[in-house]
């Protein structure tokens, strides 16, 4: 039986920290779905279609990753995709409480849905899409934190 996992998030935009998590997940699971949430309430900088395209290009070298956009409830999306594992990245203790609440709610909705928490590599443990965008808005160099295609797209958005 194939182990299918979902790595959900807004990915606005996808960072090297996200790539670190998804790359490591590909070594643990047969198929990883990078599920990009529409998240209209967060007012993303990039449209859902743009975020999907950026992530597809950034993960093209990973043969067992599928990138899709979604707007459903995560638990229902996982059920529909026949995945029973959710991958979540934990950068700091502050992330844990929220992630634990999500994990419990998802498990309440679908009892067989497991959450697997991965800690990013030290190099990426402090970055977030929001922080990268904020630094870039103030002309800070964020080249190191983003895949090349994403960096170019961010610079184009900020022009």
From Swiss-Prot:
Keywords: ATP-binding, Coenzyme A biosynthesis, Cytoplasm, Magnesium, Nucleotide-binding, Nucleotidyltransferase, Transferase. InterPro entries: Cyt_trans-like, PPAT, Rossmann-like_a/b/a_fold. Signal peptide: none annotated. GO terms for molecular function: ATP binding; pantetheine-phosphate adenylyltransferase activity. One of its GO terms (cellular component) is cytoplasm. One of its GO terms (biological process) is coenzyme A biosynthetic process. ATP binds at residues 10-11, 18, 89-91, 99, 124-130. Its EC number is 2.7.7.3. It is found in: Cytoplasm. Pathway: Cofactor biosynthesis; coenzyme A biosynthesis; CoA from (R)-pantothenate: step 4/5. It catalyses: (R)-4'-phosphopantetheine + ATP + H(+) = 3'-dephospho-CoA + diphosphate. It comes from the Bacteria. The record marks 18 as: Transition state stabilizer. Its cofactor is Mg(2+). HAMAP family: PPAT_bact. Reversibly transfers an adenylyl group from ATP to 4'-phosphopantetheine, yielding dephospho-CoA (dPCoA) and pyrophosphate. Homohexamer. Belongs to the bacterial CoaD family. This is Phosphopantetheine adenylyltransferase. The gene is coaD.
């Amino acid at each position: 039986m194939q182990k299918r996992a979902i790595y959900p998030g807004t990915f606005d935009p996808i960072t090297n920290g996200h790539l670190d998590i998804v790359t490591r997940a590909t070594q643990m699971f047969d198929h990883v779905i990078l599920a990009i949430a529409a998240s209209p309430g967060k007012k993303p900088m990039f449209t859902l279609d743009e975020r999907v395209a950026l992530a597809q290009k950034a993960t093209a070298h990973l043969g067992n990753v599928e990138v899709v956009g979604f707007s459903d409830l995560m638990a229902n999306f996982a059920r529909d995709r026949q995945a029973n594992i959710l991958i979540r990245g934990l950068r700091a203790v502050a992330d844990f409480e929220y992630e634990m609440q999500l994990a419990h709610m998802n498990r309440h909705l679908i009892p067989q849905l497991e959450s697997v928490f991965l800690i990013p590599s030290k190099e990426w443990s402090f970055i977030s899409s929001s922080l990268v965008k904020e630094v870039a808005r103030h002309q800070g160099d964020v080249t190191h934190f983003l895949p090349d295609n994403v960096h170019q797209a961010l610079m184009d958005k900020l022009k």
